[in-house]
Amino acid sequence: MRRALDSAAQAGLCVLLVGIALIAATPLRLPALGPETAVAPPGTRAMWLWEQDEPRPVVEWAAANGVRALFAYYDPQAGPAELRRLATLKGLCDDAGITLDALGGDPSWTTAHATALTWAASAAATGLFHGLHVDVEPYLLPSWPNDKAALVPPYLALLQEMSDATELPVEADVPFWLPTVTLAGGQNLADAVLARVAGVTVMSYRNTATGANSIVGVADDLLRRAGAAAKPARLGAETQALGDCSYCSFHGTSEERLHTTLSAVDAAAQRYPAFAGIAVHQYESWVALSS
């Protein structure tokens, strides 16, 4: 989920988020939970940071709210002032025990691999980042509904190329419905993505903890598949407004409601070996819940 979607993209995303809720009612053949990965303790959080916010308040907020990983937007065209800001952010994160990952991505990267690889190389060359956090979302391309079969192979190739391009681990944002897509030959798209990245953040954007159409409920299949692949999977929680999808975000609720719900997610997700905590999207709208 990029910083703020334009109205057309937001409308398209809402259709995906709302329509795919019907998937929860469809029986699926799921992989076993698997014992291969370590479960994050309750309260483990991550956070997206898309804007060029002042570093100290960001890190103070993050540390106070259990954030152990920060995904900070990186522009490969960043000038000296922005690089100094990121260096300050890195130093403060190090002091607070928070890992700093470079955040970037665009649906166009699905086929514009040179742009994506230039970004990855530039981010790695700064020496500021622990990993690369990529948010590509090819399903937001206008051609996705009709050309999905043509777009999936370059998307998977991109993830592999990025993973091979640097020594930094690559973590990908993925929609919770990814396992519903089957590739030519019968492979599941979620399994194919997990095979190419170090970990995933599931955009499980719901504002209830458990049940058929909840954060844990919609992410169950991906959590199981991540466990079988021995890859960590964070669950995502949205605090920005998402069009007409009132149950997809905590926007308009409260910090207390968010905290209570995410604590319940922590408890319910302990049964999944792949569970790596909860990532909150994003800093500014999360802070706004407390005002």
Which residues fall in each region the model found?
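N-terminal Sec-pathway targeting helices
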Residues: 1-17
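Boundary/entry segment of secreted carbohydrate-active catalytic domains
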Residues: 27-76, 172-176, 278-286
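Short, acidic/polar
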Residues: 49-64, 111-125, 181-193, 215, ...
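Aromatic-lined carbohydrate-recognition surfaces of secreted/lumenal glycan-active proteins
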Residues: 50, 99-112, 155-185, 230-241, ...
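Active-site groove signature of glycoside hydrolases
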Residues: 71-76, 119-152, 276-280
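Aromatic- and acid-rich polysaccharide-binding/catalytic face
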Residues: 72, 130, 136-140, 186-215
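Aromatic-lined substrate-binding rim segments of carbohydrate-active enzymes
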Residues: 72-105, 146-172
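Substrate-binding cleft of secreted/luminal carbohydrate-active enzymes
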Residues: 231-291
